[in-house]
Design a protein with these regions (language model features):
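C-terminal motif of bacterial Sec signal peptides marking the signal peptidase cleavage site
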Residues: 15-18
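Bacterial signal peptide processing site
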Residues: 20-22
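N-terminal substrate-binding region of glycoside hydrolase catalytic domains
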Residues: 28-106, 112-141, 147, 251-252
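Acidic (Asp/Glu)-rich catalytic clusters
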Residues: 30-31, 62-71, 95-106, 150-157, ...
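Hydrophobic faces of well-ordered beta-strands that scaffold small-molecule active sites
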Residues: 36-40, 75-77, 107-111, 160-164, ...
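Active-site beta-loop-alpha junctions enriched in small/polar residues
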Residues: 41-43, 80-82, 112-116, 164-169, ...
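Aromatic-rich peripheral "rim/lid" segments of glycoside hydrolase catalytic domains that contact
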Residues: 48-52, 117, 267-273, 285-344
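Active-site cleft segment of glycoside hydrolase catalytic domains centered on the general acid/base Glu
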Residues: 89-94, 98, 119-234, 246-263, ...
């Protein structure tokens, strides 16, 4: 995501699609294990900063518990290699994962392989890895992945999904891991090093390949076809969708990109044979009714897609007033109408 911060995740989207009717008398056939979750990676930082969260009745709640209360059934937690302040580092991730598991929430771990944000516009190498060549860097990536996952496993945590890289449409660990044109650089080497480390610690965990702009079929096909030719191995395709990202001082209509995202799903599944999870979703916090409508549109129009396995709202608990992030789904510490689909 392009982003700033926020972390809570009201990803309270739970089995919404599995609870609605699709036409008169028709039962939904969405994937039985469909999840509605949220990336809540900043929750511990927000708590330390004094922020509090409340349910609709005004009762104070711990953020992860509130996610569960509104219908969420999964969390996504990002990992940085050596963050300057410790937030989103190994120990912080273990704390948040323990909370989630105690509440019965499934856990997705999102490795950025950076000391801070990694996304399509920047994939900075961790400071400690900067002098390494590709072979040594692949080994460092594997060691970092193993270290974090073993810490989670040692704490008794189950992990259902692991992202090897964050929004890697242009590769990761630049420059050596950059993907451009017909070149994959060292990306496949790095991705497979992470994948093998995941499977060694959590053999049943699903490895996610994460790309941005789930509405942009041309770019997705370019990247996935290139990787198919390189023999890239992964279990799930993860996509991001921010259908009303601010442009020219205004929030554009959410419907065109959302409709394109939905239309792309059967094409991607037919071409590459992988289930899909929307691992990042966000809408302008100032327009909660539109955010709700966008989620409802996705859920309604994908209910027959068994290969579409879930949606994660990105940092819904983040508010522009509190943190400066304008695509959350809370106001004054409470979930807004944007998250209503989670509880249906």
């Amino acid at each position: 995501m392009r982003r700033i911060l926020t972390c809570w995740a009201l990803a309270a989207l739970t089995l919404l699609g599995a609870c609605q009717k699709h036409g008169a008398g028709a039962d939904p056939v969405q994937a039985e294990d469909f999840v509605m979750g949220a990336d809540i990676s900043w929750v511990t930082w927000m708590e330390a900063a004094g922020f509090k969260f409340f349910n609709a009745a005004g009762q104070e709640r711990e953020c992860t518990a509130l996610l569960r209360e509104i219908g969420g059934d999964a969390v996504r937690l990002r990992v940085w290699v050596n963050p300057a302040d410790g937030w989103c580092g190994k120990d912080d991730v273990v704390v948040k994962a323990k909370r989630a598991q105690a509440l019965g929430l499934k856990v997705m771990v999102d490795f950025h392989y950076s000391d801070s944000w990694a996304d399509p516009g920047k994939q900075p190498v961790p400071e400690a890895w900067k002098t390494m060549g590709p072979e040594a860097m692949a080994q460092a990536l594997a060691a970092h992945t193993t270290d974090v996952l073993q810490a989670l496993k040692g704490a008794g945590e189950d992990v259902k999904w692991v992202q090897v890289g964050n929004e890697t449409t242009n590769g990761m660990l630049w420059e050596s891991g950059r993907v451009a044109g017909t070149s994959a650089g060292e990306f496949v080497r790095y991705f497979h090093a992470g994948r093998e480390a995941v499977k060694a610690v959590y053999p049943e965990a699903q490895v996610i390949l994460h790309l941005d702009n789930g509405w942009d079929l041309d770019t997705l096909n370019w990247f996935l076809t290139l990787m198919q030719g390189k023999g890239l191995q992964y279990d799930v395709l993860g996509l991001s969708l921010y259908p009303s990202y601010r442009e020219d001082g205004a929030y554009p209509d959410w419907t065109p990109k959302t409709a394109r995202f939905v239309d792309n799903l059967p094409v991607l599944y037919r071409n590459y044979g992988k289930p899909v999870i929307l691992v990042e979703f966000g809408m302008p916090a100032a327009e909660p009714d539109k955010a709700r409508a966008a989620l409802e549109y996705i859920l309604l129009h994908t209910r027959d897609y068994r290969y579409f396995q879930g949606i994660f709202y990105w940092e819904p608990e983040a508010e522009a007033r509190r943190i400066g992030y304008p695509y959350g789904a809370f106001a004054d510490g409470k979930p807004t109408a944007a998250l209503d689909p989670f509880g249906k």
